[in-house]
Amino acid sequence: MRVLVVEDNALLRHHLKVQIQDAGHQVDDAEDAKEADYYLNEHLPDIAIVDLGLPDEDGLSLICRWRSNDVSLPILVLTARESWQDKVEVLSAGADDYVTKPFHIEEVMARMQALMRRNSGLASQVISLPPFQVDLSRRELSINDEVIKLTAFEYTIMETLIRNNGKVVSKDSLMLQLYPDAELRESHTIDVLMGRLRKKIQAQYPQEVITTVRGQGYLFELR
């Protein structure tokens, strides 16, 4: 696996690089957004770890720009911003997960591995609920044969809901799909991801297909 680390602090960047390499992965380390763009385009990383406090471009702006350019690799954010509002902003920008500073490198590694597990391919199979179609091997959602650009976590939620078409899926079940490691789970993450997912779906399919069932969870149903 190739990991892109975007961090302006040289000591922290080096520490992350060494730890990730010791885990058996290839690492490109960038000190700013310009260098990150280069590695993204030239080396095609599998996942990016992005600090928000970059010298030439705010990390949130970088993530928004990547997502608007259809960059779909998983993004793990490093941030010193601890309020829930800041965390919502990070996820809304297109990040898949975040770690607040100061952090233990073991948590960064665990969250990175969790993201990659969610993003790994499955055996070739398609779930079709016209006009919705989920390609399990490509990890893609299509509506009316048009691919909808989703982040790794958004796709996982959508696949889980479609697999349970017509049945309520609890928030706990979705959290388990996203974070197999219990200590990494934060329930409000689901609400943010669900909001992003609904907006993307409604841009192509205006009818409401994901319903919140109060006190129970979420329901995907075509009417």
From Swiss-Prot:
GO terms for molecular function: phosphorelay response regulator activity; transcription cis-regulatory region binding. Its main location: cytoplasm. CDD domains: REC_OmpR_EcPhoP-like (cd19934), trans_reg_C (cd00383). Residues 2-116 form the Response regulatory domain. GO terms for biological process: regulation of DNA-templated transcription. Residues 124-222 bind DNA. It holds the Pfam family Trans_reg_C. Member of the two-component regulatory system PhoQ/PhoP involved in virulence, adaptation to low Mg(2+) environments and the control of acid resistance genes. This is Transcriptional regulatory protein PhoP. It comes from Escherichia coli O157:H7. The lineage of its organism: Bacteria, Pseudomonadati, Pseudomonadota, Gammaproteobacteria, Enterobacterales. The gene is phoP.
